[in-house]
A protein has these predicted regions:
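Solvent-exposed loop/turn segments at secondary-structure junctions
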Residues: 91-93, 147-150, 192
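Small/polar (Gly/Ser/Thr/Ala-rich) solvent-exposed segments
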Residues: 144
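Outer-membrane pore/translocation modules
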Residues: 96-119, 307-340, 415
Length: 424
């Protein structure tokens, strides 16, 4: 909150300080009004009906959540490089609902599976931004509450699928250090999670440093060198304080206008850091490879989240859920003396011609533990999305489905949703 207050104060001070000599006769209030009046409105409306079925104790029924996300934002006109952005988000329950958010007392239903879309209204973003070219290189500084994404979201994400996005009170710097290379540094002071501000774990303080050097070469390879230093300020989260260093390379590698090689290779090492009382030394591996042809992609993938014990394992507390849309593997699992997660998967995606604007994705997962090689089950996911271009380029409808077959972990689960979204 202190970062947010500082950013608003700085923006108000920037208006009179940024006036040119020829503007000296114009009152600061009039200049401020002009900047505010000539801004840009943004809107994101998404109605979704989501259902989640899980077998076994303690669940006695299915969850269903008909929710409407209304996110309205406003960005001021740039004034001597300064601009400001503010966004509020409201989540409404439209129709009969029955689902659980365990850390939100008003919506805690222990006998129902979790769907993390709480009803409520909150300030989701509010920051001051300054942009300036420095010797031909772009320089951007942002101060305040903002959404931050690192690469594919494995370690830091906004969790855009949920109705409330994750955001941070943060200071961020982006600078072009070379022709096709950008350096990013961010200091994260507080995290606001997707379960909402009123949840017992909806917000927490931390001292985190994010560093990322991303570059592109020959339009065939994108490389990212990153570091994430997390130091939590509350005792229950001390065990999540870690230092993660990693490297990531992605394609596609274009062979000709029709064919390409789709690939991703990533490695990261995580160690205990700051207030963490435990010993942590865990690795993360990701490998994807497959052909791309005329807008279609086929990939085989392998992901490993290392784990030796319940305290010595890879943790990703700021990430969005990976490894299946049932979200059962949102965190690294533990089963007795078996820890960590190995996911092998096949995925196919592409455009559904001749329906312009329609895409589909299908993925099959097979799960094992990292230690002891216990089979955790398998999952089949598919998604359909259709941009209704004949009516509006801003309108999309779609569905998402995930079915998990249990083995030695969890119980059978089915999560499905349909949605309609309008973005401006």
């Amino acid at each position: 909150m202190r970062i947010l207050v500082l950013s608003v104060t700085a923006f108000c001070l920037a208006i009179p300080l940024g006036l040119k000599a020829e503007d000296a006769g114009e009152p600061a209030a009039r200049a401020l009004w002009t900047v505010l009046q000539q801004g840009k409105v943004s809107a994101d409306l998404r109605y979704r009906f989501e259902t989640f079925e899980r077998e076994g104790t303690p669940f006695t029924g299915d969850s269903y959540a008909p929710t409407l996300r209304i996110a309205l934002g406003y960005e001021t006109r740039s004034f001597h490089g300064f601009s400001a952005f503010v966004q509020g988000t409201a989540v409404l329950v439209i129709g009969p609902a029955d689902y659980s958010i365990p850390t939100l007392p008003s919506q805690n239903r222990p006998d129902r599976p979790v769907i993390s879309d709480p009803r409520g209204i909150q300030l989701s973003q509010g920051y001051l931004r300054w942009r300036r070219p420095v010797e031909g290189h772009r320089l951007t500084v942002a101060l305040g509450r903002q959404e931050i994404m690192l690469n594919d979201g494995r370690f830091v994400s906004i969790s855009s699928w949920r109705q409330i996005h994750q955001s941070f009170d943060a200071a961020r710097l982006d600078v072009d250090v070379a022709r096709q290379a950008t350096f990013t540094y961010a200091f994260l002071n507080r995290c606001y999670r997707v379960v909402g501000h009123d949840a017992t774990d909806g917000k927490f303080s931390l001292h985190a440093h994010l560093l990322n050097l991303a570059g592109q070469k020959s339009r065939r390879i994108n490389v990212s060198l990153y570091g994430l230093l997390l130091d939590y300020r509350s005792v229950p989260k001390y065990g999540l304080s870690t230092r993660t260093l990693g490297v990531r390379a992605t394609g596609p590698y274009e062979i000709n206008p029709q064919w390409s090689v789709l690939y991703t290779a990533e490695f990261a090492n995580q160690r205990d850091f700051g207030s963490n009382p435990n010993h942590v030394n865990a690795n993360y591996y990701l490998a994807e490879l497959g052909p791309g042809w005329r807008g279609f992609g086929f990939k085989a993938g392998y992901a490993l989240l290392g784990g030796r014990s319940a305290t010595d394992e890879l943790t990703t507390p700021l990430a969005n859920p990976f490894n299946g849309w049932t979200e059962l593997f949102a965190s690294n699992p533990n089963l007795g003396s078996s820890h960590g997660l190995e996911a092998r998967y096949l995925t196919a995606s592409g455009k559904l011609k001749p329906l312009d604007g329609a895409t589909a994705t299908v993925t099959y997962y097979d799960y094992h533990s990292d230690s002891n090689r216990i089979h955790y089950g398998s999952e089949l996911d598919w998604a359909l999305a259709y941009k209704v271009k004949r009516i509006s380029n801003h309108w999309e409808i779609g569905s998402r489905f995930g079915c998990y077959w249990a083995d030695r972990l969890y119980t059978h689960a089915l999560r499905a949703s349909v949605y309609t979204q309008f973005t401006l």
